[in-house]
Amino acid sequence: MAKVSLEKDKIKFLLVEGVHQKALESLRAAGYTNIEFHKGALDDEQLKESIRDAHFIGLRSRTHLTEDVINAAEKLVAIGCFCIGTNQVDLDAAAKRGIPVFNAPFSNTRSVAELVIGELLLLLRGVPEANAKAHRGVWNKLAAGSFEARGKKLGIIGYGHIGTQLGILAESLGMYVYFYDIENKLPLGNATQVQHLSDLLNMSDVVSLHVPENPSTKNMMGAKEISLMKPGSLLINASRGTVVDIPALCDALASKHLAGAAIDVFPTEPATNSDPFTSPLCEFDNVLLTPHIGGSTQEAQENIGLEVAGKLIKYSDNGSTLSAVNFPEVSLPLHGGRRLMHIHENRPGVLTALNKIFAEQGVNIAAQYLQTSAQMGYVVIDIEADEDVAEKALQAMKAIPGTIRARLLY
């Protein structure tokens, strides 16, 4: 392979929030040794200072990459979210700068599904309330309000990777599984898709939420929806904190319309483990509250570390953007010559202008890869030419109207 445009030991990776050591091991094994690692999140000023000369940043859910922070990152090439969600990153601002954002949407699927199963079993048996009372010295041995999971109906809202895993695990306990999704999905096992959310809420003994955070899911479980739930049923939310209207949930618990709940995510969460946590749900003994630990298992964090680090390495090594959330997706083979990358506004004439540059210089294009999204185009061009010719072509590419970013990869 031709010499890379920037030596790997000069490419800086900024990793915050204690991403798993497997990520560091993967980066070092690939030749990336210039790594700045922080166990916790950085405040805005520290973040801006550290990211200023970083080429890559890896973060989890507490660090917020706003447009202001992204614009302070003068050399930033890509962002890796070592978690499922990417709502902590201004995706549009990153796209405008030609910066792809990668995440690990499936690596903690099993961990979240197992947590929900555990919460479901505890709630059905009334363990949270019995445990709280026992801690206060109250012995309350009763069968009333305590149930087996077998034969109960589980309603899953959002039948994606976590929802399907949950359904499989619940069926193994003898539960009847129903799900609601905005798209028609192929059921796994004996699960049944329900066409209307209200029907799912009416029939389910336990309702578990597994939806993304977007305008359509904000407070999707409000007073109206909770009132449609079966009296004495249970609500579990291990998806996003904005999905459940917390005051409405408190009202349903206080009136005993719901027998209990398990909440792992909240509308606002402490920035660090040393910050206090407050919620009106704290007053209810029959509610399980956990600090956003759905994906916090050693296995999940290791898988996430390997997956996201691998995506950053591939993008740095050969320009592949497969599974980027804000960027045209291209999976690329290695090439022995020179590789140039051009990120541009999706408008007519750009590809023609690019090809004209090489035609005028008498340079043959060995391979060309193009992928577009609604707003952006991403072209990777492999050529057989010396470094001076490639550098001259790069400068001409940068001058094309509509160019967001262009660089010589190697």
Swiss-Prot record:
SUPFAM superfamilies: ACT-like, Formate/glycerate dehydrogenase catalytic domain-like, NAD(P)-binding Rossmann-fold domains
UniProt gene name: serA
Broad EC category: oxidoreductase
InterPro entries (alphabetical): ACT-like_dom_sf (IPR045865), ACT_dom (IPR002912), AHAS_small-like_ACT (IPR054480), D-isomer_2-hydroxyacid_DH (IPR050223), D-isomer_2_OHA_DH_cat_dom (IPR006139), D-isomer_DH_CS (IPR029753), D-isomer_DH_CS1 (IPR029752), D-isomer_DH_NAD-bd (IPR006140)
Molecular function GO labels: 2-hydroxyglutarate dehydrogenase activity; identical protein binding; NAD+ binding; NADH binding; phosphoglycerate dehydrogenase activity; serine binding
Stated role: Catalyzes the reversible oxidation of 3-phospho-D-glycerate to 3-phosphonooxypyruvate, the first step of the phosphorylated L-serine biosynthesis pathway. Also catalyzes the reversible oxidation of 2-hydroxyglutarate to 2-oxoglutarate.
Protein family: Belongs to the D-isomer specific 2-hydroxyacid dehydrogenase family.
UniProt protein name: D-3-phosphoglycerate dehydrogenase
Organism: Escherichia coli (strain K12)
Reactions listed under catalytic activity: (2R)-3-phosphoglycerate + NAD(+) = 3-phosphooxypyruvate + NADH + H(+); (R)-2-hydroxyglutarate + NAD(+) = 2-oxoglutarate + NADH + H(+)
Gene Ontology BP term (one): L-serine biosynthetic process
E.C. code: 1.1.1.95, 1.1.1.399
Keyword terms, alphabetized: Amino-acid biosynthesis, NAD, Oxidoreductase, Serine biosynthesis
NCBIfam families tied to this protein: PRK11790.1
Catalytic site: 240, 269, 292 (proton donor)
Signal peptide: none
